[in-house]
Protein backbone atom coordinates (compact mmCIF):
# COMPACT_ATOMS: atom_id res chain seq x y z
CA UNK A 1 0.00 0.00 0.00
CA UNK A 2 1.29 3.47 -0.94
CA UNK A 3 2.03 5.68 2.05
CA UNK A 4 -0.22 8.74 2.39
CA UNK A 5 0.98 12.30 1.92
CA UNK A 6 0.73 14.18 5.22
CA UNK A 7 0.38 17.96 5.20
CA UNK A 8 -0.11 19.92 8.43
CA UNK A 9 0.38 23.67 8.06
CA UNK A 10 -0.17 26.73 10.21
CA UNK A 11 0.54 30.13 8.64
CA UNK A 12 -0.76 33.59 9.55
CA UNK A 13 -1.30 36.34 6.98
CA UNK A 14 -2.89 39.78 7.41
CA UNK A 15 -5.91 38.63 5.37
CA UNK A 16 -6.40 35.11 6.75
CA UNK A 17 -4.80 32.12 8.44
CA UNK A 18 -3.90 28.90 6.65
CA UNK A 19 -4.60 25.91 8.85
CA UNK A 20 -4.56 22.42 7.33
CA UNK A 21 -4.31 18.87 8.61
CA UNK A 22 -4.46 16.52 5.65
CA UNK A 23 -3.71 12.86 4.93
CA UNK A 24 -3.86 12.58 1.15
CA UNK A 25 -3.67 9.47 -1.04
CA UNK A 26 -0.16 8.60 -2.19
CA UNK A 27 -1.49 7.74 -5.66
CA UNK A 28 -3.81 9.25 -8.27
CA UNK A 29 -4.84 12.89 -8.62
CA UNK A 30 -5.82 14.97 -5.61
CA UNK A 31 -7.47 18.30 -6.42
CA UNK A 32 -7.14 21.31 -4.12
CA UNK A 33 -10.30 23.20 -4.97
CA UNK A 34 -11.72 26.49 -3.81
CA UNK A 35 -12.22 30.15 -4.71
CA UNK A 36 -9.36 32.59 -5.24
CA UNK A 37 -7.66 33.39 -1.94
CA UNK A 38 -8.68 30.13 -0.27
CA UNK A 39 -5.08 29.00 0.29
CA UNK A 40 -4.69 26.45 -2.53
CA UNK A 41 -1.48 27.82 -4.01
CA UNK A 42 -0.03 28.57 -0.57
CA UNK A 43 -0.43 24.90 0.38
CA UNK A 44 1.19 23.81 -2.88
CA UNK A 45 4.14 26.19 -2.44
CA UNK A 46 4.70 24.93 1.10
CA UNK A 47 4.74 21.33 -0.13
CA UNK A 48 7.26 22.37 -2.79
CA UNK A 49 9.42 24.17 -0.22
CA UNK A 50 8.97 27.53 -1.96
CA UNK A 51 7.35 28.85 1.22
CA UNK A 52 8.13 27.79 4.76
CA UNK A 53 5.17 27.36 7.09
CA UNK A 54 5.58 28.83 10.57
CA UNK A 55 4.38 25.53 11.98
CA UNK A 56 4.43 22.63 9.56
CA UNK A 57 4.84 18.92 9.04
CA UNK A 58 5.07 17.49 5.53
CA UNK A 59 5.79 13.86 4.78
CA UNK A 60 5.74 12.33 1.29
CA UNK A 61 6.22 8.57 0.84
CA UNK A 62 7.79 8.19 4.30
CA UNK A 63 10.28 11.03 3.69
CA UNK A 64 9.89 14.06 5.95
CA UNK A 65 10.20 17.31 3.99
CA UNK A 66 9.36 19.65 6.85
CA UNK A 67 9.07 19.18 10.59
CA UNK A 68 9.20 22.58 12.27
CA UNK A 69 9.23 21.10 15.77
CA UNK A 70 12.47 19.24 15.04
CA UNK A 71 14.07 21.84 12.77
CA UNK A 72 13.72 19.83 9.56
CA UNK A 73 13.28 21.71 6.28
CA UNK A 74 14.32 20.02 3.06
CA UNK A 75 15.37 22.44 0.31
CA UNK A 76 13.11 22.52 -2.78
CA UNK A 77 15.72 20.94 -5.08
CA UNK A 78 15.95 17.93 -2.75
CA UNK A 79 12.21 17.21 -2.69
CA UNK A 80 11.93 15.28 -5.98
CA UNK A 81 8.96 17.28 -7.22
CA UNK A 82 7.81 18.35 -10.64
CA UNK A 83 6.18 21.78 -10.46
CA UNK A 84 3.93 23.08 -13.24
CA UNK A 85 2.95 26.77 -13.05
CA UNK A 86 0.04 28.61 -14.66
CA UNK A 87 2.34 29.61 -17.50
CA UNK A 88 5.30 27.53 -18.63
CA UNK A 89 8.56 29.38 -17.91
CA UNK A 90 10.59 28.17 -20.89
CA UNK A 91 13.93 29.45 -22.18
CA UNK A 92 12.95 31.26 -25.37
CA UNK A 93 16.51 31.19 -26.77
CA UNK A 94 16.57 27.37 -26.64
CA UNK A 95 14.68 24.83 -28.71
CA UNK A 96 11.99 22.68 -27.11
CA UNK A 97 14.47 19.78 -27.08
CA UNK A 98 17.09 21.86 -25.29
CA UNK A 99 14.49 23.06 -22.76
CA UNK A 100 13.60 19.46 -21.98
CA UNK A 101 17.23 18.32 -21.81
CA UNK A 102 18.01 21.16 -19.40
CA UNK A 103 15.90 19.46 -16.72
CA UNK A 104 16.86 15.94 -17.71
CA UNK A 105 20.61 16.51 -17.40
CA UNK A 106 20.23 17.34 -13.70
CA UNK A 107 19.09 13.78 -12.98
CA UNK A 108 21.79 11.07 -12.88
CA UNK A 109 20.97 8.36 -15.42
CA UNK A 110 20.44 5.57 -12.82
CA UNK A 111 17.82 7.75 -11.07
CA UNK A 112 15.82 8.60 -14.19
CA UNK A 113 12.28 7.24 -14.12
CA UNK A 114 11.26 8.88 -17.41
CA UNK A 115 13.33 9.43 -20.55
CA UNK A 116 12.94 12.13 -23.18
CA UNK A 117 11.18 9.95 -25.77
CA UNK A 118 8.60 8.68 -23.27
CA UNK A 119 7.80 12.20 -22.04
CA UNK A 120 7.41 13.64 -25.54
CA UNK A 121 5.17 10.75 -26.61
CA UNK A 122 2.99 11.04 -23.50
CA UNK A 123 2.45 14.77 -24.12
CA UNK A 124 2.25 14.55 -27.92
CA UNK A 125 5.10 17.00 -28.54
CA UNK A 126 7.51 14.89 -30.64
CA UNK A 127 6.92 17.14 -33.65
CA UNK A 128 7.74 20.29 -31.65
CA UNK A 129 11.26 19.37 -30.50
CA UNK A 130 13.15 21.62 -32.91
CA UNK A 131 10.88 24.65 -32.51
CA UNK A 132 11.54 27.65 -30.28
CA UNK A 133 9.01 28.35 -27.48
CA UNK A 134 7.94 31.65 -29.08
CA UNK A 135 6.63 29.64 -32.05
CA UNK A 136 4.32 27.53 -29.87
CA UNK A 137 0.68 28.04 -28.95
CA UNK A 138 -0.24 28.48 -25.30
CA UNK A 139 -1.40 24.88 -25.07
CA UNK A 140 1.79 23.58 -26.69
CA UNK A 141 3.96 25.63 -24.31
CA UNK A 142 2.11 24.19 -21.34
CA UNK A 143 2.53 20.62 -22.59
CA UNK A 144 6.26 21.27 -22.95
CA UNK A 145 6.29 22.64 -19.39
CA UNK A 146 4.58 19.50 -18.10
CA UNK A 147 7.05 17.29 -20.00
CA UNK A 148 9.98 19.22 -18.52
CA UNK A 149 8.58 18.69 -15.03
CA UNK A 150 8.21 14.96 -15.70
CA UNK A 151 11.82 14.71 -16.84
CA UNK A 152 13.03 15.64 -13.36
CA UNK A 153 11.81 12.11 -12.39
CA UNK A 154 9.58 13.43 -9.60
CA UNK A 155 8.02 11.42 -6.81
CA UNK A 156 5.22 13.99 -6.70
CA UNK A 157 3.78 16.30 -9.36
CA UNK A 158 2.44 19.70 -8.28
CA UNK A 159 0.23 21.49 -10.81
CA UNK A 160 -0.80 25.05 -9.94
CA UNK A 161 -3.82 25.92 -12.11
CA UNK A 162 -1.99 24.72 -15.24
CA UNK A 163 -4.95 25.51 -17.52
CA UNK A 164 -5.98 28.87 -16.03
CA UNK A 165 -4.22 30.96 -18.69
CA UNK A 166 -5.70 28.99 -21.60
CA UNK A 167 -8.93 29.44 -23.52
CA UNK A 168 -11.57 26.72 -23.63
CA UNK A 169 -10.23 25.18 -26.85
CA UNK A 170 -6.65 24.92 -25.53
CA UNK A 171 -7.89 23.48 -22.23
CA UNK A 172 -9.76 20.82 -24.18
CA UNK A 173 -6.53 19.94 -25.99
CA UNK A 174 -4.51 19.43 -22.79
CA UNK A 175 -7.00 17.57 -20.58
CA UNK A 176 -6.69 14.26 -22.50
CA UNK A 177 -2.91 14.38 -21.99
CA UNK A 178 -3.33 14.89 -18.24
CA UNK A 179 -5.72 11.92 -18.20
CA UNK A 180 -3.12 9.86 -20.01
CA UNK A 181 -0.44 10.74 -17.44
CA UNK A 182 -2.91 9.67 -14.77
CA UNK A 183 -3.47 6.30 -16.45
CA UNK A 184 0.06 5.45 -17.51
CA UNK A 185 2.37 6.90 -14.84
CA UNK A 186 2.65 5.89 -11.22
CA UNK A 187 3.23 9.45 -10.02
CA UNK A 188 0.81 11.09 -7.57
CA UNK A 189 -0.39 14.57 -8.53
CA UNK A 190 -1.68 17.49 -6.50
CA UNK A 191 -3.76 19.66 -8.81
CA UNK A 192 -4.83 23.19 -7.85
CA UNK A 193 -7.92 24.59 -9.57
CA UNK A 194 -11.02 26.69 -9.07
CA UNK A 195 -12.67 25.20 -12.20
CA UNK A 196 -15.16 22.54 -11.19
CA UNK A 197 -15.27 20.97 -14.67
CA UNK A 198 -11.51 20.26 -14.57
CA UNK A 199 -11.73 18.79 -11.09
CA UNK A 200 -14.70 16.58 -11.98
CA UNK A 201 -12.86 15.24 -15.00
CA UNK A 202 -9.45 14.58 -13.45
CA UNK A 203 -9.58 14.15 -9.69
CA UNK A 204 -9.81 10.97 -7.64
CA UNK A 205 -9.68 12.80 -4.30
CA UNK A 206 -11.00 16.28 -3.54
CA UNK A 207 -9.87 18.79 -0.92
CA UNK A 208 -12.23 21.75 -0.57
CA UNK A 209 -10.61 24.90 0.84
CA UNK A 210 -12.13 28.18 1.96
CA UNK A 211 -10.35 31.08 3.68
CA UNK A 212 -7.35 28.89 4.49
CA UNK A 213 -9.39 26.13 6.13
CA UNK A 214 -10.19 22.62 4.95
CA UNK A 215 -13.95 22.25 4.57
CA UNK A 216 -13.77 18.68 3.31
CA UNK A 217 -11.34 16.03 2.09
CA UNK A 218 -12.36 12.72 0.56
CA UNK A 219 -13.00 10.66 -2.58
CA UNK A 220 -14.54 12.90 -5.23
CA UNK A 221 -17.74 10.92 -5.74
CA UNK A 222 -18.53 11.13 -2.02
CA UNK A 223 -17.46 14.74 -1.51
CA UNK A 224 -19.46 16.13 -4.45
CA UNK A 225 -22.58 14.44 -3.07
CA UNK A 226 -22.39 16.06 0.39
CA UNK A 227 -25.30 18.41 1.01
CA UNK A 228 -23.48 20.25 3.80
CA UNK A 229 -20.86 21.69 1.42
CA UNK A 230 -21.07 24.79 -0.82
CA UNK A 231 -20.51 22.65 -3.93
CA UNK A 232 -24.02 21.21 -3.58
CA UNK A 233 -25.59 24.67 -3.56
CA UNK A 234 -24.41 25.96 -6.94
CA UNK A 235 -25.99 25.53 -10.34
CA UNK A 236 -23.23 23.04 -11.27
CA UNK A 237 -24.06 20.73 -8.35
CA UNK A 238 -23.89 17.11 -9.35
CA UNK A 239 -22.06 13.83 -8.92
CA UNK A 240 -19.23 12.07 -10.72
CA UNK A 241 -19.74 8.41 -11.54
CA UNK A 242 -17.06 6.07 -12.88
CA UNK A 243 -18.84 3.13 -14.45
CA UNK A 244 -17.84 0.26 -16.73
CA UNK A 245 -18.84 -0.06 -20.37
CA UNK A 246 -20.83 -3.30 -20.56
CA UNK A 247 -22.52 -3.12 -24.00
CA UNK A 248 -22.85 -1.02 -27.14
CA UNK A 249 -25.84 -0.58 -29.44
CA UNK A 250 -24.37 0.21 -32.87
CA UNK A 251 -27.74 1.03 -34.39
CA UNK A 252 -28.57 3.74 -31.85
CA UNK A 253 -24.93 4.49 -30.91
CA UNK A 254 -25.62 4.06 -27.21
CA UNK A 255 -23.19 2.78 -24.61
CA UNK A 256 -24.48 0.80 -21.66
CA UNK A 257 -22.54 1.79 -18.55
CA UNK A 258 -22.83 -0.35 -15.43
CA UNK A 259 -22.65 1.58 -12.16
CA UNK A 260 -19.94 0.52 -9.70
CA UNK A 261 -20.86 -2.21 -7.23
CA UNK A 262 -24.32 -2.89 -8.66
CA UNK A 263 -26.25 -4.20 -11.65
CA UNK A 264 -27.80 -0.80 -12.38
CA UNK A 265 -26.99 0.66 -15.79
CA UNK A 266 -27.21 3.94 -17.67
CA UNK A 267 -27.27 4.41 -21.43
CA UNK A 268 -25.08 7.13 -22.87
CA UNK A 269 -24.89 8.51 -26.41
CA UNK A 270 -21.23 8.02 -27.36
CA UNK A 271 -18.93 6.45 -29.91
CA UNK A 272 -18.16 2.77 -29.42
CA UNK A 273 -15.73 1.88 -26.64
CA UNK A 274 -14.20 -1.45 -25.73
CA UNK A 275 -16.24 -3.54 -23.29
CA UNK A 276 -14.72 -3.17 -19.83
CA UNK A 277 -13.53 0.40 -20.39
CA UNK A 278 -13.93 2.66 -17.36
CA UNK A 279 -15.99 5.72 -18.24
CA UNK A 280 -16.33 8.79 -16.04
CA UNK A 281 -19.57 10.75 -16.34
CA UNK A 282 -21.22 13.62 -14.50
CA UNK A 283 -24.89 13.83 -13.66
CA UNK A 284 -26.07 17.34 -12.73
CA UNK A 285 -28.61 17.65 -9.92
CA UNK A 286 -30.75 19.89 -12.12
CA UNK A 287 -31.01 17.06 -14.68
CA UNK A 288 -32.54 14.57 -12.23
CA UNK A 289 -36.28 14.45 -11.59
CA UNK A 290 -38.14 12.07 -9.28
CA UNK A 291 -41.18 9.87 -9.78
CA UNK A 292 -43.06 7.47 -7.54
CA UNK A 293 -43.07 4.91 -10.34
CA UNK A 294 -41.10 4.13 -13.48
CA UNK A 295 -42.52 5.99 -16.46
CA UNK A 296 -42.06 3.69 -19.45
CA UNK A 297 -43.80 6.16 -21.77
CA UNK A 298 -41.08 8.80 -21.69
CA UNK A 299 -38.19 9.96 -23.87
CA UNK A 300 -35.92 9.84 -20.80
CA UNK A 301 -33.60 6.85 -21.27
CA UNK A 302 -32.20 6.55 -17.80
CA UNK A 303 -34.59 5.68 -14.98
CA UNK A 304 -33.04 4.21 -11.85
CA UNK A 305 -34.60 2.86 -8.64
CA UNK A 306 -33.28 4.97 -5.75
CA UNK A 307 -33.64 5.47 -2.02
CA UNK A 308 -33.82 8.90 -0.38
CA UNK A 309 -30.89 9.49 1.97
CA UNK A 310 -31.37 13.14 2.98
CA UNK A 311 -32.81 16.46 1.88
CA UNK A 312 -31.65 20.07 2.28
CA UNK A 313 -32.75 23.53 1.19
CA UNK A 314 -30.97 24.81 -1.91
CA UNK A 315 -29.51 28.31 -2.28
CA UNK A 316 -32.77 29.22 -4.03
CA UNK A 317 -35.40 28.69 -1.33
CA UNK A 318 -37.93 27.51 -3.91
CA UNK A 319 -35.81 24.37 -4.36
CA UNK A 320 -34.48 21.49 -2.32
CA UNK A 321 -31.55 19.18 -2.93
CA UNK A 322 -32.19 15.49 -2.45
CA UNK A 323 -29.37 12.98 -1.94
CA UNK A 324 -30.21 9.55 -3.32
CA UNK A 325 -28.70 6.08 -3.25
CA UNK A 326 -28.74 4.22 -6.57
CA UNK A 327 -27.40 0.77 -5.76
CA UNK A 328 -24.50 2.22 -3.78
CA UNK A 329 -23.88 5.15 -6.13
CA UNK A 330 -24.83 8.60 -4.78
CA UNK A 331 -27.01 10.89 -6.90
CA UNK A 332 -28.31 14.42 -6.33
CA UNK A 333 -31.65 15.80 -7.50
CA UNK A 334 -32.64 19.46 -7.47
CA UNK A 335 -36.44 19.80 -7.34
CA UNK A 336 -38.94 22.38 -6.10
CA UNK A 337 -40.13 22.32 -2.51
CA UNK A 338 -43.62 21.97 -3.95
CA UNK A 339 -42.62 18.74 -5.72
CA UNK A 340 -41.00 17.47 -2.53
CA UNK A 341 -44.24 17.99 -0.62
CA UNK A 342 -46.32 16.43 -3.40
CA UNK A 343 -44.13 13.32 -3.33
CA UNK A 344 -44.07 13.36 0.48
CA UNK A 345 -40.32 12.84 0.36
CA UNK A 346 -38.71 11.30 3.44
CA UNK A 347 -35.58 9.42 4.40
CA UNK A 348 -35.68 5.77 3.33
CA UNK A 349 -38.38 6.32 0.70
CA UNK A 350 -37.96 4.35 -2.54
CA UNK A 351 -38.78 5.97 -5.87
CA UNK A 352 -37.41 6.45 -9.38
CA UNK A 353 -34.77 8.93 -10.52
CA UNK A 354 -35.22 10.12 -14.10
CA UNK A 355 -31.91 11.34 -15.52
CA UNK A 356 -32.43 13.74 -18.41
CA UNK A 357 -28.75 14.18 -19.36
CA UNK A 358 -25.44 12.46 -18.72
CA UNK A 359 -22.18 14.28 -19.54
CA UNK A 360 -19.22 12.10 -20.50
CA UNK A 361 -16.07 13.43 -18.83
CA UNK A 362 -13.44 10.83 -19.69
From Swiss-Prot:
It is a peripheral membrane protein. Its EC number is 7.3.2.5. It is found in: Cell inner membrane. GO terms for molecular function: ABC-type molybdate transporter activity; ATP binding; ATP hydrolysis activity. SMART domains: AAA. ATP binds at residues 34-41. GO terms for cellular component: plasma membrane. Keywords: ATP-binding, Cell inner membrane, Cell membrane, Membrane, Molybdenum, Nucleotide-binding, Translocase, Transport. It comes from the Bacteria. Its main location: membrane. PANTHER family: ABC TRANSPORTER I FAMILY MEMBER 10, MOLYBDENUM IMPORT ATP-BINDING PROTEIN MODC 2. Part of the ABC transporter complex ModABC involved in molybdenum import. Responsible for energy coupling to the transport system. This is Molybdenum import ATP-binding protein ModC. The lineage of its organism: Bacteria, Pseudomonadati, Pseudomonadota, Gammaproteobacteria, Pseudomonadales. The gene is modC.
